[in-house]
Design a protein with these regions (language model features):
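An extracytoplasmic/periplasmic, membrane-proximal ligand-sensing/linker region
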Residues: 33-35, 176, 216, 242, ...
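N-terminal export leaders
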Residues: 6-11
Length: 326
């Protein structure tokens, strides 16, 4: 059976197709015209939550619309990621999450109800958080080399972690430096701190937001920074790369995502908002106080960076023998 399409129908279809980009642009011009929602996969009051709210407060100012923050902690941020994956792709529901969740969870869980590459469109990456290698304030170790030498000299080493991200960072150090150690899990960093102080733990790689307070009150000391940049509030503490572990780079970066299928003009508008925010002097100052620095990566750059991170962490996680969770 043959089907014939009239010239008039073809012209009509072409006209509709031609107007679609214009319609999307018109929607973006009016966007946002109602409250925005940001989903964060960490508890209210946590370092991640504080980091996110620095951005949402400014987003509210720039967009002219209220921004509602919804904390959905659990499962290494998988709950929050799933919520946004199932949201309407209209730009009004956003996900604030770390690359450690978006890149590592694929290898830390047996199965996920989403694909972090295919099911989301990055808006922008806007901050990077520093971590530090810490020991008790009374420890004899003065440098990372001192600590590494001791760890290599004995088999019964212990490090502490509070989540899967911290576990991966510690294993990254262990693999590159070449020593044996076992993980001791804790519910929170405050729970683990006494065992860092008294030497039960040989070391801990700690979120800089929490660690800075403990360093200031004299409970612990930092031997190294895990990022390729030094933390402004402890400028005399060198990076792991500077101390001989060339290429060591662990500094979770934060980005905003929307569901796949969100119109490109809306993504571009949100990207512009985030770049404005990251360049604000008071945001830079606020981030510095929590061991962070601003990033200004756009949508395409963030997508490429995330893809690279997914590939980077697979061999490290598998070599560590970390059993994927259900």
């Amino acid at each position: 059976m043959k089907f014939q399409v009239s010239r008039r129908a073809l012209i009509g279809a072409a006209a509709i197709a031609a107007t679609m980009p214009l319609a999307a642009a018109a929607v973006a011009q009016d966007f946002p015209n109602r409250p925005l929602k940001v989903v964060i996969g960490f508890p209210a009051g946590s370092g991640a939550d504080i980091l996110g709210r620095n951005i949402t407060n400014k987003l509210q100012e720039i967009s002219g619309q209220p921004v509602v923050v919804e904390n959905r902690p659990g499962a290494n941020s998988n709950i929050a990621i799933g919520v946004v994956k199932n949201a309407k792709p209209d730009g009004y529901t956003m996900l604030f999450v770390a690359n450690s969740n978006m890149a590592m969870n694929k290898w830390l869980f047996k199965s996920l109800p989403f694909d972090t590459i295919k099911d989301f469109t990055p808006v922008a990456a806007w901050a990077q958080l520093g971590f530090v290698v810490v020991v008790g304030a009374d420890s004899k170790h003065k440098t990372l080399a001192d600590l590494t030498a001791l760890l290599k000299s004995k088999p019964q080493n212990k490090y502490g972690t509070t989540n899967q991200t911290a576990l991966v960072s510690s294993e990254y150090y262990r693999q590159l430096a070449g020593f044996e150690a076992v993980n001791v899990g804790y519910r929170t960093a405050p729970d683990a701190t006494p065992d860092v102080v008294n030497g039960t733990l040989d070391f801990m790689i700690m979120d800089g937001t929490f660690a800075l307070g403990q360093i200031r009150n004299g409970k612990i000391k930092a031997l190294a920074v895990t990022s390729l940049w030094r933390i402004a509030d402890i400028p005399d503490v060198p990076t792991m790369d500077e101390q001989g572990l060339k290429g060591f780079d662990f500094a979770p970066w934060w980005a905003t995502y929307v569901p796949a299928g969100t119109p490109a003009p809306i993504v571009a508008k949100l990207e512009g908002y985030h770049k404005q925010i990251a360049a604000m002097p008071d945001i830079k100052e606020a981030l510095q106080k929590i061991a962070s620095v601003p990033l200004t990566l756009g949508s395409a750059e963030t997508a490429a960076k995330l893809a690279g991170e997914v590939a980077k962490w697979e061999p490290i996680i598998k070599a560590a023998g970390i059993v994927p969770q259900e």
